[in-house]
């Protein structure tokens, strides 16, 4: 394995959600520990599942993994980090300032921006703590899905330059004082990330066009900010021995080989390793040990076929239920890589085919929609909330309004204020709230961003709800976006997941988060199911049998409505292929 050769002190795994970077980072940590290395495995993912993989509770302090000698682990929970960060800043001023001032400061520190800063603080501390490298030979970071990872890794440079040029702080950066004390740490973190002698970045992908395109963008963006020591790992490759088993296996194998032969520009030059698709889920040390075996192609498996597709669990039944309301907001939520874009497009096309007026829109920073929906329908409008464009529009609006009467020094300060990372969150939310107003007259189908971004989006929505409620007081009736999201008559939230242990668990966690915000998911879609795909391939049959318990968990514990969507022989791009999903 190329990525395992001469590993430096820091190793980062990144990639779209669901590609297996947690499994590979855990397997790498086990491999290094078995070679006698002292290893620290760190998760900075908001939906962390390292503890689930090792069947052990892992918190925000370093602790040994009981099943693997020489391996320790740490999970950084951004929400917990934000709470501790708030306490550090607010507690010292309680009793010194009036209560309303303290409450105002606390509220300013309750948004998504503070959560990012707090998580970044912990991330930076690990990268710049020299004592850790006396305790550990390698520190492995299991990072979040691609969009979040890029932002996380860009933060050192962004905050470092922002603090350097704006020593007086800025209105939207509540915890600036705390950041100022650690300015040298940020510079050292950037230095460590950019040093190929100390840091290696492993891009993890599956042999799917959209996943490879996203990894190529990640490669370009990280290279542009100085992280050039990159390797590529392609996970879940179907072995050639399965190709002759049946039509589905042959189609999957052919599709993967074509993708491998036509890697996007930039990726083909990277040192690359391929990992075979495994018959079992990657949970537990014994399963993980076999993952990095280059010669582990499956040679013999029992011939077992999953049972037929269950009744009333097709996507068409779900769409028929949605159509009865004749209009409304349909929001698809879930971890990145589970197929939200494709499911949103399939539902939108199906509703449009039924004669309804439909607006399909996305806030996904990766912008997959244009590639997924390659065609047009008369009564289907397709749009994208572009984070970059919306941020620029928001900046200009603020400069033209709030900045109109400022002197030159004030304008410069405001411009710097608008360069902070939280500005994009505000801008995207404002665009999002404009779109959902249309749902009173037609169907609005939203393909939302991956899990971490979705939670930040909902946090922004809640903050906006509180602000409107505060301003309106008792003056009359009003409806905020949050109120619309909470109303199942007007909004149907669909959770999209895969029939695998970790994606189901993460979707269940997302459901809990939504319910705490007063939002109750209307149904679940389990995508890419082999269990209902009628395959005769022994390996694919084994994978299908692994799905059944997870489908039962969703059905019995989490979802009031459920749809199963099979793995397709051809990638579902274009209107005709999307129609085949709704059967």
From Swiss-Prot:
Catalyzed chemical reaction(s): arsenite(in) + ATP + H2O = arsenite(out) + ADP + phosphate + H(+)
EC number: 7.3.2.7
Keywords: Arsenical resistance, ATP-binding, Nucleotide-binding, Plasmid, Translocase
Binding site for ATP: 15-22, 334-341
InterPro entries: Anion-transp_ATPase-like_dom, Ars_ATPase, ATPase_ArsA/GET3, P-loop_NTPase
Enzyme class: translocase
Pfam families listed in its UniProt record: ArsA_ATPase
Domain of life the protein comes from: Bacteria
GO function terms (MF aspect): ATP binding; ATP hydrolysis activity; ATPase-coupled arsenite transmembrane transporter activity
Function, as annotated: Anion-transporting ATPase. Catalyzes the extrusion of the oxyanions arsenite, antimonite and arsenate. Maintenance of a low intracellular concentration of oxyanion produces resistance to the toxic agents.
Family of this protein: Belongs to the arsA ATPase family.
PANTHER family for the chain: ARSENICAL PUMP-DRIVING ATPASE ARSENITE-TRANSLOCATING ATPASE, ATPASE GET3
Protein name per UniProt: Arsenical pump-driving ATPase
Taxonomic source organism: Escherichia coli
Gene: arsA
